[in-house]
Amino acid sequence: MGMEVIRETLRIARPVADVWRAWTDPAWVAGWHAERVEGELCTGERVELHWDSLGMAIELEVIAVEAPRRLVLRGTPPGRPPQTLTVELADDGMATSLAISHDGFLPGQAGAEERAGTAAGWRTATRVLAHYLARHAGQSRTCAAALAPVAAALDDIAPLFERPGWLAGELAIGGEGSPIAFRTAGGRALRGRVLASALPRQIALGIDDTAGVLVLRAIRLDSHAALVGAMVWSWEPDRPAHAELAASLEPALARLVAALGGPAAGGAA
């Protein structure tokens, strides 16, 4: 049985040159995807993508760079087969058609959770990319994140994202594009819209008052445990609303873990 492929497409209302730059210029990549990029995107070279706020990094081999239409990268996750990411861009009137294929996933139940998590990640990332290009192209950002293991099933976590008290007042999350309005635990009013919804694994909220994004995620560890996380960033980090939201992440996550029954065995919130 062959390896499985994840696909994601999106029409982005920006010219191909801008979308290509967002995938290949390290400064622009750091504006929406990895927080830091080391290396050159040249065929045969290797690049490292770093998420410093999460303590994560991956190394990728550059397989093909066909400016401004096609980019192919390959990486080998620990203990798993190699995976290949292909990004293709095409003119679509006054916009760009983005097509992503990410292959090399184990078929069937063996790779089901990794496929689902990666698919959720690409749905979120592509919508964040569109938001970045529409409002903040070329701007740098400041990121903060918090992670915690929790003794809860994946499907039990997402409903609590909307529960008052853990992060803010009541946070009603609708479909992609729907407006949001809530108050932080400190009482500050925030407004924005849902950028991406890939529940129960991820949700991304564009926050107008912070000039940034809040991503909530849950990663299944086993049938009774998960890793929950919150990541916030801003392209205008001097805004007081961003500083307040970023400072609230760790205590807010501790409250969420407590509401779910406590940390998973071997971890602490």
Predicted regions and their residues:
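Signature tryptophan residues that serve as conserved aromatic anchors
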Residues: 20-23, 32, 75, 122, ...
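Short beta-edge strand/loop motif at the mouth of beta-sheet-based domains
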Residues: 7, 14-18, 24-70, 142-145, ...
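Surface-exposed beta-loop interaction hotspot
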Residues: 106-159
